[in-house]
Amino acid sequence: MTNAPLTSTPVPATTKPISNGTDAPLFSSQLISPEVLAALPPGYTIRPLRRSDFQRGYLDVLRVLTTVGEVSDEQWNQRYDWISSRNDEYYLLVVCDEAERIVGTGSLIVERKFIHSLGLVGHIEDIAVEKGQQGKKLGLRIIQALDFVASNVGCYKVYPFALKLILSRQWLTVCV
């Protein structure tokens, strides 16, 4: 995955819009890979999460991956505001179909380290694709897009989602 220089500097917060109650994206769409956009099936797009994605099925897509629970509009807005306030740590992407319905998602969480000259490490998490949309390489495109974001915000290393799954299974095998 990403092999950015060891002297990583976080992207200034001004490159990521804060929603302030509007439907602005969670971060700048300039961080979306043009190559990934071009590789999506016709009619699909990938973009940063927006506040209005609650109504577009964001949580329903996450339910393919894990338990989400019942989340009210108010709870969604509180969590969205909290994530948005950490404007150089959280990068959540969604894939939308022609109807602007969310069919896939993934997250990049940026961790600050003391090592590697106060470097940044990216963690790709929560890759989920709606069951009826699987088989279109949308999960792969989400991972590629998040890796591109990680590289562009200065991460010297990225831990991919799939590797975590493999390692956790191997770890369980060793521990049993």
Regions found by a protein language model. Name each.
Residues L140, F148-V158, L163-V176:
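Conserved active-site alpha-helix within GNAT-family acetyltransferase domains
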Residues M1-S52:
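Conserved N-terminal entry element of GNAT/NAT acetyltransferase domains
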Residues Y44, A99-T105, G122:
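Glycine-rich phosphate/pyrophosphate-binding loop shared by adenosine-nucleotide-utilizing enzymes
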